[in-house]
Amino acid sequence: MSKRLLRSLLSLMVCMAMLLSLAPALLAESADAPSTEMAVGAVIHGFEVVENGEFALLNAKTTVLRHQKTGATVFFLINEDTNRAFDISFVTPLSDDKGIPHVFEHSTLDGSKKYPSASLFFNLIYQTYNTYMNAATYQVMTTYPVASLSEAQLLKYADFYLDSCFNPMIYEDESLFRSEAWRYSL
């Protein structure tokens, strides 16, 4: 694995861990009440608060944090909506039309160290209390969004996505990648 990719993955992992550790304290605050802990310039777990703002369309308060060592960025949004969401995204620019980032998107969700079941993603989609769960690959990025009305469930989904992204079973079982990547042309 290249140093650049490893550094990017580490940045995202640190970013998401920090976001999850802040969530309970931030969610306890009212959307209208300013948080003294989130003042611009404050440093929280190695992340500097670089901007506070509002997103009028969603009647939301926003905070942008940047990790001092890695440059990873966290965008935190809080409003009165009871539907909670989590997303982890990676820059995955295409170098050709072979669809390799899309194959990795599928392979990533075919089990992880903590969640070794290859069918767990589909079980989570159809048999749990989520309001949205998916993964998508675009020309420049791959994203793994999930939403739920239950904060406890959302944290479990986030844990599943994080472990799938950073500890995928494809390292242990190369056939998972091959089963997603095979192609037959006439």
Residue ranges and their predicted role:
Residues 11-21:
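Bacterial N-terminal signal peptides
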Residues 78-157:
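M16/MPP (pitrilysin/insulinase) zinc-metallopeptidase core fold and M16-derived inactive scaffolds
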Residues 1-13:
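Bacterial N-terminal signal peptides that target proteins for export
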